[in-house]
Amino acid sequence: MNQKEIDHLESINSFYAKGDYMDQLSIEREIEIIKQYPVNGKSVLEVGCGSGYSTERLIKIFPDYEVIEPSQKNISLLKQKISNIICHNVLLEDFSSKRKYDYIFFLNIIEHVEDPIESLKALTSIVKDEGLIFISSPNCMSLNRRAGYKMGTLETYEKMAPKDYEVGHRRLYTVDMLTDHCNQAGLKVLSMKGIYLKPLSEKQMIELGDSVVRAFHALGEEIPQYCATIMAVATKKYY
């Protein structure tokens, strides 16, 4: 058990406890993409549940559902929403199971972990041979970050914003970087999706209103390289 890592995760719980409107919209869009794949009879493992916002919605689609969550504070938030869910209170690196899952949801987690490639390898070992792993992360080459760089408000594309540090991000991704990490872990990316084409700052987007923001969330699906969030749908290369 890596107590330092658990302490790190507990320290950012306040973000999940208070909730975030824009993050919730992104989660809803991620779920819409997941629903494009077969759902009946699929066993699911979600790695990291945050406040439980995604879990509460996904378990209605996938009744055979388990969660890995190392933060006891996050588990408490989850249990307030779903009291009877199977939840493993361990780090991914410490999770041991004879069971293999049809789908694994690794949504907005890879940017938090110490060693992303090792984490992906761990997922590869517990997904079924033809199962799918859904991996989402913030994109440092998003349209708004490209604009910020051109305006001189962003020193480099890779530089993280204050909110990134607030929520415990260790890195930001690009489409190529996420694809490469999957490849190194023995995964093949079947599809790369974009979530939230974000041309303006978060504050400016919110001021445009809910319907506009939702439209831009959907608009970016086929142009991931410009979106605020990217999602890889991956499967094992070898089995």
Whereabouts are the PLM-identified features?
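A short His-aromatic
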Residues: N108-H112
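Short glycine- and Lys/Arg-enriched binding-loop motifs that mark or flank ligand-binding interfaces
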Residues: V44-E46, V127, D164
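S-adenosyl-L-methionine-dependent methyltransferase catalytic module, highlighting the catalytic core
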Residues: A17-Y21, L25, Y53, E114-S125, ...
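Active-site acidic short loop of glycosyltransferases
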Residues: K98-D102, D115, D129
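Surface-exposed loop/turn positions
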Residues: K42, E130-G131
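Conserved N-terminal segment of class I S-adenosyl-L-methionine
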Residues: M1-R99, Y103-L107, L120, G194-L197, ...
